[in-house]
């Protein structure tokens, strides 16, 4: 079961990750993966979902982790920094299920995470 950084109403699943463990597990190694998506993670388009993941979810997560990055300090947006404490080093966008893996999206009518 994985939590997403964002999802577009057009179907794209977006995950931003710092060390690759969350994005890797969404791509390989499991027979079935459930993606849990709260209503706050939904955006109308792919572009808006990606913007939300980078500029809302990632800065809040960096703050939660106590990182010394521009986004955590200011809390307002992604600065595309090169900080060694950067939490957004990898991006995976899923347009559909990966070959040989069953995927299911569970939409929850609550705000979940950032």
Whereabouts are the PLM-identified features?
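Internal alpha/beta core interface subdomains
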Residues: 24, 28-114
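Active-site glycine-rich loop that binds ribose-phosphate moieties when present
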Residues: 15-23
């Amino acid at each position: 079961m994985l939590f997403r950084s964002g999802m577009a109403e057009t179907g794209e699943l977006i995950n931003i990750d710092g060390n690759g463990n969350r994005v890797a597990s969404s791509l390989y190694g499991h027979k079935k993966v459930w993606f849990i998506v709260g209503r706050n993670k939904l955006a109308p388009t792919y572009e808006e979902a990606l913007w939300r993941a980078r500029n809302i979810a990632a800065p809040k997560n960096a703050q939660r982790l106590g990182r010394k990055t521009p986004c955590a300090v200011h809390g307002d947006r992604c600065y595309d920094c090169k900080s060694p404490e950067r939490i957004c080093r990898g991006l995976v966008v899923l347009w559909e299920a990966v070959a040989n893996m069953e995927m299911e999206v569970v939409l929850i009518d609550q705000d979940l995470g950032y």
